[in-house]
Amino acid sequence: MESRICFSLNGKDVSITTDPLRRLIDVLREDFDCKGVKEGCSEGECGACSILLNGKMVTSCIIPVGAADGQQIMTIEGVSATEKGRIIIDAFADGGAVQCGFCIPGMVIATYYLLSNNPDPTEDEIRLGLSGNICRCTGYDLIVESVRLAAKRGG
């Protein structure tokens, strides 16, 4: 049975009538054109589908859209429109952290969440903050350095 689900998406109030058990990632990508939310593992393990739900980082591939009713969601599209998001994205580009690019939206979300809660993280804190996100291209060192660069720039 379909239900009307209302939530804030990247600062804009939206609603959709759909099956509340549909995966949130599918609604974001298919109904709201948030193509930066990537699907990797479909099990909540790789972090490619990371979003901010009420300011907390979550994996949207394992959350039913019904759980988003009345909540605030920020995707990479919303983060990239903020000053902090632009600083992080620029630091990733300048630091050479982007190769294939598939994991980067999730990595940027993780970095945004980390730096919002800890503006001057240690290397161990950065690695812990990124631990829910998988990258098979860079080996993480360039990503960690890019997070440091973003923190230094005020991200």
Residue ranges and their predicted role:
Residues M1-G155:
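Signature of N-terminal electron-transfer/Fe-S-associated modules in redox systems
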